[in-house]
Amino acid sequence: MMRTIKIYVPPGQPGPLLEFLPTLDEKLRRKLLQQIVRLSQIHLCDLKEPHFKHFVLEKYNQLYELREKNKVLARIIFTIRDGDFILLAPFIKRQPRDTMKALEQSLKMLADIRDAPEFAVNMKWEEYL
C-alpha cells in the first residue's frame, strides 16, 4: 500500500524541506530521499529504529523522526494524519537541543496545518531521485 507523503509549505514560501534538501551533499540527499520513498511503502508497525523513532513524551507523541546519516546526522520530524505522512521540520543534528528545537517547530507547523489544511501539500519526491 502506497501512502501519500505530504510536506509543510506555508503560503508564498518553498517550505522547510524543499529548502533543506539542496543544502545536503548528494549522497546524504539520496539516502534521505530513499528513506522517504520507503516511508511511503512501510507498514506503521515497521516504524522502528535505527531509521525511524517515535517520540513517547505526551507533548510530542504524535511526532516521529526519520533518521539518516552520512558524515552528519540528517533528521526530519514527521507525523501521521489520516494514514498519510506529513514531513515537517528537517534539520542536521549537531547537539541534543537541535531535536527539541525541531519538535517545537513541528508543533507550530501542526497547528498551522490544523488551521489551514492546504499548508500540507503532496510531495513530488520523484523529482529529487
Over which residues does each language-model region extend?
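Basic, Lys/Arg-enriched alpha-helical interface segments
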Residues: 1-72, 82-85, 92-129
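Short, surface-exposed beta-strand/loop micro-motifs that present aromatic residues
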Residues: 75-79
